[in-house]
């Protein structure tokens, strides 16, 4: 099998990622104002029920690239019990999964394989980039390592760390669940708007900025 890795031109035409034009729009719920009270409330309730089922039954695809995968599977142990979030059903096939966790270093030879696995996943699907290597290449600023998996697939949640702790992975699942709960996808092929709307989530750094600035008592360097 021949592997190729093509750099994406954000301003050019590309039949792969991004698979559709992405732009920031106003809240899609505002269009419900123009509908009748009954149909607007009914469609809003249907979206909430569908998103509740999706966010509480996330099936991750079982594969790993490097040491971050060890931290990922640690969250499945009884100590952390990721089953509380409905994400314990590991799938051996991408066609049965809706979450891909890129855990570890993404080498240039592995990038086309990850791209193909992502294409085989059915919608709706989400991606978590776990660890510094998956986010930006980490300390491997060399020709053989892709400097971030978001160069060729869309990423929903980034987990910093080298490697991140299992608690960080579980927090990423909670953030992903929050994002899924605010999504608006077509209820069917013929009913409602056919566009996919994803909430513009605030980064954790920005969300906690005020709380961190307000801290007056700092811990000493020898404390954990």
UniProtKB/Swiss-Prot annotation:
Q: Name one GO molecular function term.
A: quinone binding
Locations listed in the record: Cell inner membrane
Keyword Plastid found: no
- Which EC number(s) are documented for this chain? 7.1.1.-
GO CC terms in record: plasma membrane; respiratory chain complex I
Which cofactors does this gene product need?
[4Fe-4S] cluster
Recorded hits in Pfam families, A to Z, give: Oxidored_q6
Which SUPFAM superfamilies does the record associate with it? HydA/Nqo6-like
UniProt-listed PROSITE patterns: COMPLEX1_20K (PS01150)
Biological process terms in GO annotation: aerobic respiration; electron transport coupled proton transport
Subcellular location, principal? membrane
Q: How is the cofactor bound?
A: Binds 1 [4Fe-4S] cluster.
Q: What class of enzyme is it?
A: translocase
- Give the reaction(s) catalysed: a quinone + NADH + 5 H(+)(in) = a quinol + NAD(+) + 4 H(+)(out)
Hydrolase listed as a keyword: no
Q: Topology versus the membrane, per the UniProt entry?
A: Peripheral membrane protein
Binding of [4Fe-4S] cluster: at which residues?
A: 67-68, 133, 162
Q: Which family does it belong to?
A: Belongs to the complex I 20 kDa subunit family.
Describe, as the record does, how this protein assembles with itself and its partners. NDH-1 is composed of 13 different subunits. Subunits NuoB, CD, E, F, and G constitute the peripheral sector of the complex.
Stated role: NDH-1 shuttles electrons from NADH, via FMN and iron-sulfur (Fe-S) centers, to quinones in the respiratory chain. The immediate electron acceptor for the enzyme in this species is believed to be ubiquinone. Couples the redox reaction to proton translocation (for every two electrons transferred, four hydrogen ions are translocated across the cytoplasmic membrane), and thus conserves the redox energy in a proton gradient.
Protein name (database record): NADH-quinone oxidoreductase subunit B
Q: Which organism is it from?
A: Citrobacter koseri (strain ATCC BAA-895 / CDC 4225-83 / SGSC4696)
């Amino acid at each position: 099998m021949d592997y190729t890795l093509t750099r994406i031109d954000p301003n050019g035409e590309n039949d792969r990622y991004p698979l559709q034009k992405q732009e920031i729009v106003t809240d899609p719920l505002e269009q419900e104002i123009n509908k009748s009270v009954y149909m607007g409330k009914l469609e809003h309730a249907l979206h909430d029920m569908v998103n509740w089922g999706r966010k509480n039954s996330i099936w991750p695809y079982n594969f790993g690239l490097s040491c971050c995968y060890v931290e990922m599977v640690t969250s499945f142990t009884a100590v952390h019990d990721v089953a509380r979030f409905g994400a314990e059903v590991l799938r051996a096939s991408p066609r049965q999964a809706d979450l891909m966790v890129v855990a570890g270093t993404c080498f240039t030879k592995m990038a086309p394989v990850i791209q193909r696995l992502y294409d085989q996943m059915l919608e709706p699907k989400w991606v978590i980039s776990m660890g510094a290597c998956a986010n930006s290449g980490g300390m491997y600023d060399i020709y053989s390592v892709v400097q971030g998996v978001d160069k060729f697939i869309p990423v929903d949640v980034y987990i910093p760390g080298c490697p991140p702790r299992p608690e960080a992975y579980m927090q990423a699942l909670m953030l992903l669940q929050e994002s899924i709960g605010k999504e608006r996808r077509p209820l069917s092929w013929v009913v409602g708007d056919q566009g996919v709307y994803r909430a513009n989530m605030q980064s954790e750094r920005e969300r906690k900025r005020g709380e961190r600035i307000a801290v007056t008592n700092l811990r000493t360097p020898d404390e954990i």
